[in-house]
Amino acid sequence: LATFALSIESPAFLFKNQKIVYQENHPKAFYDSMAFWNDEEGIAIGDPTEDCMSIIITRDRGETWTKLSCDDLPKAREGEAAFAASDTNIAIVGDHTWVATGGMASRVLYSSDKGETWSVFETPIVQGKATTGMYSIDFYDEKMGFAIGGDYTKPNDTLANKIRTTDGGKTWQVVADGKGPGYRSCVQYIPNSNGK
C-alpha cells in the first residue's frame, strides 16, 4: 500500500509514504494535481517553470519521477498555468490523459499514450485573467468530457464557465451559458451513468 503527497510550492516535494521520491527547487515550481493510470504509472502537473507546463511521470510505482522536457510538450502561452483548487486538473480514461490549464489562456493538453506524446486543444471557457479558466476536468469515456471553472473572484458569474466535448477534447462547446452554477472547482462523472 502506497500513499502519495504532493506539495505545491518551491521547493516542490513528492512523497511516497514518508520518502521523498521527487524534489524540484526551481523558484517557480508549483504543482497542482496528480493521478495514476495504473499501479505502475502516474503523472503530476504543475505551472510552467520554463515555456511549458511542468509534467512529471513515474513508470515504476512512484519510486522515481522524471520531468518531461519542454521539447516534448506544447508551449505554454503567456500567463497560462493550472489551479490547485481540487486536484482534478487531470482526467484519465485508459491510456488517454487530459490536463486542464487556466489563467490568461485555458486549454487542454492531451496524450493518447500515457504521456509519451502531447497535443493541445483550444477551449471557449472564460479566460484572459490570472483567476479565470478551467479549474476541473473529467471524462466519462474516451470521447465525452466536461470541464468547469470560471473566475473565483466572481463566484456568481455564469458566462462561459461550463464546457463539454463529445470528440475526446478536440472541440468544446459552452453549455448552460448564463445559467447556474457559477464558479466551481470540481466536476466528476458518476460511473455507469452513461455520462448523464
Language-model regions, residue ranges each:
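Entry beta-strands of beta-propeller and related beta-repeat scaffolds
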Residues: 1-2, 40-44, 96-98, 143-147, ...
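Signature of short aromatic-glycine-proline-rich micro-motifs recurring in repeat-based ectodomains
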Residues: 82-90, 134-136
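Loop/turn-rich, solvent-exposed surfaces of beta-rich toroidal or solenoidal domains
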Residues: 150, 156, 176-196
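Short glycine/acidic-enriched loop and turn motifs that connect beta-strands
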Residues: 8-9, 48-52, 104-106, 152-155
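Asp-box/BNR beta-propeller loop motif
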Residues: 6-26, 55-76, 109-127, 157-179
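Repeated scaffold domains used in trafficking and secretory/extracellular systems
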Residues: 28-35, 131-136, 183-188
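Oxyanion-binding "anion nests"
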Residues: 132-164
